[in-house]
Amino acid sequence: MHDANIRVAIAGAGGRMGRQLIQAALGLEGVQLGAALEREGSSLLGSDAGELAGAGKTGVTVQSSLDAVKDDFDVFIDFTRPEGTLNHLAFCRQHGKGMVIGTTGFDDAGKQAIGEAAKDIAIVFAANFSVGVNVMLKLLEKAAKVMGDYTDIEIIEAHHRHKVDAPSGTALAMGEAIAHALDKDLKDCAVYSREGHTGERVPGTIGFATVRAGDIVGEHTAMFADIGERLEITHKASSRMTFANGAVRSALWLKGKDKGLFDMKDVLNLNYL
């Protein structure tokens, strides 16, 4: 990586998240927008990335080929789809580029591929790049250790109508944080759907409920419910810029790191809490 500014490339530059990532990259000191990518055949190819994001002319044109821009960036930021992200991962591993991965919906094989690539390159992989969400995950660990064995735990999440995976990656991360605090495996205690005559709630399970509606950016609540009282820990996002700023901050944090798999707890130094 260069000694001066960290140069970032943005995948899916024409999407809602891509445009905000461009804005965030242009707004953070120490970061330089080096490249912007869109799929082959996109009408946005050749556009100025800054103008596309409403941030003014930058001289960085939207490209479809990573090969064409491989010398223009140090860290690749990807919030696209699992299949595309894994293709980008292979390229970055081959060429020694760091990655910030905010894509959700990976299966176990995809997560394993990311872990393998981190033996050769530095990767920040997180379900959510919001500072508030990651503080919430730490709070959930604390609450679960105190209340988890005595309460019914439910996770409710809501997103816009265009989101294609459920539960959200953040909801799953919440479940993982709670399960880990209780020395459980989420796969063994998660309940993802209830329909018909389900019988009574099984003690020790973690329930998930999903809402998809309108333009909700992202809302997540963890509920610890007992007889006579209920604790709820909630995070609500009103703008995707909170995720974009966290992702670009993560790219800057990767400066000087050659390899390893990290998450936002590392970036924010939350592990000491």
UniProtKB/Swiss-Prot annotation:
GO terms for cellular component: cytosol. (S)-2,3,4,5-tetrahydrodipicolinate binds at residues 160, 169-170. Its EC number is 1.17.1.8. Pathway: Amino-acid biosynthesis; L-lysine biosynthesis via DAP pathway; (S)-tetrahydrodipicolinate from L-aspartate: step 4/4. GO terms for biological process: diaminopimelate biosynthetic process; lysine biosynthetic process via diaminopimelate. NADP(+) binds at residue 39. Coiled coil: none annotated. GO terms for molecular function: 4-hydroxy-tetrahydrodipicolinate reductase; NAD binding; NADP binding; oxidoreductase activity, acting on CH or CH2 groups, NAD or NADP as acceptor. Catalyzes the conversion of 4-hydroxy-tetrahydrodipicolinate (HTPA) to tetrahydrodipicolinate. HAMAP family: DapB (MF_00102). NCBIfam families: dapB. Belongs to the DapB family. This is 4-hydroxy-tetrahydrodipicolinate reductase. It comes from Escherichia fergusonii (strain ATCC 35469 / DSM 13698 / CCUG 18766 / IAM 14443 / JCM 21226 / LMG 7866 / NBRC 102419 / NCTC 12128 / CDC 0568-73). The lineage of its organism: Bacteria, Pseudomonadati, Pseudomonadota, Gammaproteobacteria, Enterobacterales. The gene is dapB.
